[in-house]
Amino acid sequence: MGKVIGIDLGTTNSCVAVMEGTTPKVIENAEGARTTPSIVAFTDDGERLVGQPAKRQGVTNPERTFFAIKRLIGRTFEDPMTKKDIGLVPYKITKAPNGDAWVEADGKPYSPSQISAFILQKMKETAESYLGQPVSQAVITVPAYFNDAQRQATKDAGKIAGLEVLRIINEPTAAALAYGLDKKGSGTIAVYDLGGGTFDVSILEIGDGVFEVKSTNGDTFLGGEDFDTRLVEYLADEFKKENGIDLKKDKLALQRLKEAAEKAKIELSSATQTEINLPYITADATGPKHLALKLTRAKFEALVDDLIQKTVEPCRKALKDAGLSAGEVDEVVLVGGMTRMPKVQEIVKQFFGKEPHKGVNPDEVVAIGAAVQAGVLQGDVKDVLLLDVTPLSLGIETLGGVFTRLIDRNTTIPTKKSQVFSTAEDNQTAVTIRVFQGEREMAADNKLLGQFDLVGIPGAPRGVPQIEVTFDIDANGIVNVTAKDKATNKEQQIRIQASGGLSEADIDKMVKEAEQHAAEDKVRRELVDAKNHGEAIIHSTEKSLAEFGTKVAESDKSTIDAAIAALKTELAGENLEGIKAKTDALVQASMKLGEAMYKAGAEGGESAEAPKDDVIDADFKEVGPDDHKKSA
């Protein structure tokens, strides 16, 4: 069994870690960074970029650069949050045939699971490069408040990336695992997790290696992206007041504003004032326009105050569900990049009445926790038991469109609950069961996970047939349903097919595409390596020709010149085999040059030697240790 890795698939950044013995280790990517931007881009020639290279070209290629894709995962196109996102991002969000929200680049649609899979592939490659062996299994984190569709879509992303997802683990729970791994004694902790796109709060009891989640709450559409958006809107409004030009209509300018907003937000966590300078942001008939603005921390805090306040209510609900007061919480752990903001720390301190714990790296702690869970599953980490909860109530639609709860929110998972259903009409042979997740009283106001028909019920008067339906939520927080006709004891396993979601055929197709992309990437890498090698050979040959060209025959020199010209022509194209062949031809041709160099070197060496007959015998005497001492 190979290593199981832990991946924090974040909205803004992702991170991968692995257990080395009993110690978790965050792995640096190819660029030398410990986190990777969760960004995927497609260039003009169809090349796919992931991470920092994708982020770097985002300003000049906004319509094909996908960021914050996690906000769309597992959502339908009609979801109010999707509609909100459409107005915030420069790329195209489209409606998939199954009703889900997908994205599009150059007319080609991609599911959010697919885009996420490209990021997961990058994390997989990062781990493989470090470990020196293939990786096929992972633990992936999700926001605690993710529903079933979002969890399933994340699991699908892992599958598309070529990973068997052994466990989906909640981000605050992972953070608690990392925080409490070496802690002795017991206590109650609150994990306040404000990341790039989502907010979670979890209350846990920790003691003797047992991590028990008491409650969880959150908002899957609240995070750093919203803080950036507020700042972008402010900058655009200020610019419009001064210049009469609306930058929101210019995708290129908007992307530059977003980049500047993110940078300013980060700077204001340590500085009380920052300057935003964007020369040549746009132009009109009077010439180019520049954006230059001073921004104070106080102004930024005023712009986003309501967003920070939105995190307080979930904290209140989580405490209420756990049956605790703020004073009964022993420690508050901050997770997510946004918790570096002083105002956020101040609000947390006010609410919980204590200074939050800042001893963990908010960007890495979730991946570390995922690696710990991977270690538990692999048997490398002993005496750790994780008891998580389901964040949302699960139930069905009953007469009158009412939501009847079967499993309440904050129930410890895995869990199982059975309910007996019957028919509403005489001789009814089929019944439709609609499964929902949420907290509203009417089913239609909650998230429809899917529906299924029970068929083949023996004809009988209404209310007589007894069909036992069992709902079970596994350790990943994913729902499974079984149905049994109590009269015949015939059992049927039902996979909830959500109204949206990817089918097995969709996933298989995307897996094949990902494999094909990986093969294309390999060829592209080989081509770049071959070109670099060819150019290096040309450079060294031309340098040697300039130095030793006079030492080789004119015919050999002509052959070398011709080989260089042929390779240069080939390097302008994309033919890998042609480049390799022409490089080999130049290496062969330049062998004559090598011979001339060695010959010249040998001759130079001989002329430096004195004739044997002129060797002079020298007198010598032995030197004692004291003779080495020099007088000052």
From Swiss-Prot:
SUPFAM superfamilies noted in UniProt: Actin-like ATPase domain, Heat shock protein 70kD (HSP70), C-terminal subdomain, Heat shock protein 70kD (HSP70), peptide-binding domain
Keyword annotations: ATP-binding, Chaperone, Nucleotide-binding, Phosphoprotein, Stress response
Entry's induction text: By stress conditions e.g. heat shock.
Residues found modified as Phosphothreonine: T198
Cysteine pairs bridged by disulfides in the record: none
Chain's role: Acts as a chaperone.
Name this polypeptide is given: Chaperone protein DnaK
Organism encoding this protein: Beijerinckia indica subsp. indica (strain ATCC 9039 / DSM 1715 / NCIMB 8712)
Lineage, uppermost ranks: Bacteria, Pseudomonadati, Pseudomonadota, Alphaproteobacteria, Hyphomicrobiales
